[in-house]
Design a protein with these regions (language model features):
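TPR-adjacent "capping" and linker segments in tetratricopeptide-repeat scaffold/adaptor proteins
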Residues: 2-18
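Short coil loop/turn residues that delineate tetratricopeptide repeat
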Residues: 14, 48, 82, 115, ...
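Conserved alpha-helical positions within TPR/SEL1-like repeat arrays
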Residues: 17-28, 51-62, 85-95, 118-129, ...
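Structural signature of tandem alpha-helical TPR/SEL1-like repeats
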Residues: 28-41, 62-75, 94-108, 128-142, ...
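Alpha-helical protein-protein interaction modules
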Residues: 165-168, 172, 179, 183-276
């Protein structure tokens, strides 16, 4: 390359580094918009400056411009694929902001198409993961209204209602789930749990029987059947199903029993104690 071209290129790199340094100072002071301008100038002067792309990405992330941030992190990585820092920074961004970014994109999808059931469903699931239970329930309810024949959002809503202790509302959803999907083992099991919690033992037994027809060896099913019969005062049945559960995973069952009041009527019974 001609010497003057190389000199000009070096001048650009020096100037780029100056803008980059100024951008860092501004970002540290919280002047994010000004910092963005400096990092962009640095990139204009030296498009291959991975650290300028990286710094720009960090400021974008702080401003919650997640799509722009992701683009800059990926550019930095493309420029320096062997850089541990580039991989580390991208990983930090994803682990910190992936949930927030997903929410923003789902909401954008819904804004563009308000009657998009899967977008409402997945937004609801993301809210649930973030502990935003009321928001999650609202989105799942919308997904159900938009696609009443889909059992999945109903089951997810029922699970949230169960966690909140609203077994009556969960039962309403789960009855629909098993009507729409009669082979859904988990739904029959959950319906049985809800009925048992409300004191409807015969209904609980019927739901557990349907679950048993689909998977008789399931640990949770046998444990819950034992709990139901213990509450119901059917000692022999309770012990028989508890024995089945213990055979599958003794340690797990012991852990559950440590805090489970449903088995209080059996504690101290020689046959119950003999299981352990």
């Amino acid at each position: 390359l001609p010497r003057e071209f190389m000199a000009r290129e070096n001048d650009n790199i020096v100037a780029s580094d100056e803008h980059n340094s100024r951008g860092i100072e501004l970002a540290d002071r919280g002047w994010l918009d000004e910092a963005i301008k400096e990092f962009k100038k640095a990139i204009d002067l030296d498009p291959d400056s991975a650290h300028a792309h990286d710094n720009l990405a960090t400021v974008y992330a702080e401003k919650k411009l997640f799509r722009e941030a992701l683009g800059e992190y990926l550019t930095a990585l493309k420029l320096e694929p062997e850089s541990p820092t580039a991989h580390y920074n991208l990983a930090c961004f994803l682990s910190t902001h992936a949930g927030e970014m997903a929410v923003a994109e789902y909401r954008e999808a819904i804004e563009l198409d308000p009657e998009y059931p899967d977008a409402h469903l997945n937004l609801g699931l993301t809210y649930a993961d973030q502990g935003r239970i009321e928001d999650a329930m609202r989105e799942l309810q919308t997904a159900i209204e938009l696609d009443p024949q889909d059992a999945f959002p109903r089951h997810e809503l029922a699970a949230l209602l169960m966690d909140e202790g609203d077994y009556r509302s969960a039962i309403t959803q789960l009855k629909e789930v098993v009507r729409l999907d009669a082979e859904n083992f988990e739904a029959h099991l959950d319906l049985g749990i809800c009925y048992a919690q409300k004191g409807f033992y015969a209904e609980a037994e019927r739901s557990y029987e349907k679950a048993k027809a689909l998977n008789a060896e399931d640990l949770l099913l046998n444990y819950n059947l034992a709990a139901l019969y213990a509450l119901w005062g059917r000692r022999a049945d309770a012990l028989a199903f508890l024995q089945k559960a213990v055979t599958v995973d003794r340690q797990k069952v012991q852990g559950w029993l440590a805090t489970d009041t449903m088995f209080d009527s059996l504690k101290g019974d020689p046959e119950f104690d003999a299981l352990f």
